[in-house]
Amino acid sequence: AYEDMAMIRREDELMAEADAFIRQWHGTGLTTVAVGPGSTEDISDRLMAKTIAMARSRGLQLATHVAGWAEIVSRSVKHYGMRDLEHVHHIGLTGPASILIHAVWLSPHEQQLVAETDSKIAHCPVANAHLGYGVAPVPELRTLGVDVGLGTDGAASYTYDLFEVMKTAAMLQKVQHLNAEVLTAEDTLEMATVDGARVLGLEERIGCLAPGMRADIILVDFRQPHLILNHQLASKLVYSARGHDVASTIVDGRVLMRDRQVLTMDEDRVLDDAAAACRDLVERAGIETRDLLGATWPERGPRWRKAAGPDWYEGGTNG
């Protein structure tokens, strides 16, 4: 009983912290806050329901990892008698203001459920590939009318370069379907811009250049060997460009970077602070984690899997 009460208190503390964060930051300047429970395996259904209620009552979006890896689906079937997407739908998380991250292992029925509830998808192809999650059914979802945007997931993906994300998104689908036209450069560019804005619920403010929209613009330097033939611009941007090809950025009409010089911060200081924070994080993680991070490449994979335990992979299906 004591442990349960302690858990309830901790949940209340978390909700209070989230409420304070929303009050402080949502709608200030260009900042928009969403509620982001990690996944159905990170928190209890009870806390998930509380976060859903908070988001709905405040008119905020929800974002959570759903059916990203095969084993979360198999464990969901084992524990709840339903697949992961079916589970979050049962809890009440799906809907027009809900962003489902990854959504790799979706059955045809679940894909239809996403469409029927007008839920949104944050597709993270680089993270999915790097972590061995699988290939999300992006063309199938788009055919059903689902809004699919592009994401980076997090540091585990090893990139925040959206050009690389675009290229990976297109390439994975071509290989998966053995069809070079299943997801075109134009499709992918839409996912990175107008579709991404719809996923975020910001389509009336960002996502394209039009009268009344915020002036969010990047200037790409095409005078480079890999970009010099600048016909078929969509293909060039998706398949050849990289983040370092961006020369200048403008956000809401304000120039933040000009000729690759960031105007709003001291880059060297930020990099030094980040390096120090990384060292501190690894140090505090303990000797076992430091050991694993320092392992050489032939043994790192097996050691990580051994450390994760026998349930590291339980299999699953997206069929």
Language model features with spans:
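Metal-coordinating catalytic core of metallo-dependent amide/deamination hydrolases
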Residues: 1-105, 109
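Long hydrophobic segments that form regular secondary structure
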Residues: 106, 110-119, 124-130
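His/Asp/Glu-enriched, well-ordered alpha-helical/loop segment
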Residues: 90-97, 139-227, 239-242
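Short, acidic/turn-prone active-site loops that include or flank metal/cofactor-
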Residues: 68, 125-129, 154-156
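Glycine-enriched alpha-helix->loop->beta-strand junction motifs that scaffold or abut catalytic
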Residues: 52-61, 93-96, 113-122, 143-149
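Histidine/acidic-residue-rich catalytic or RNA/ligand-binding cores of hydrolases
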Residues: 70-82, 110-115, 132-141, 158-174, ...
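Active-site microenvironment of metallo-dependent hydrolases
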Residues: 193-319
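Conserved, mostly hydrophobic/aromatic
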Residues: 35, 65, 88, 100, ...
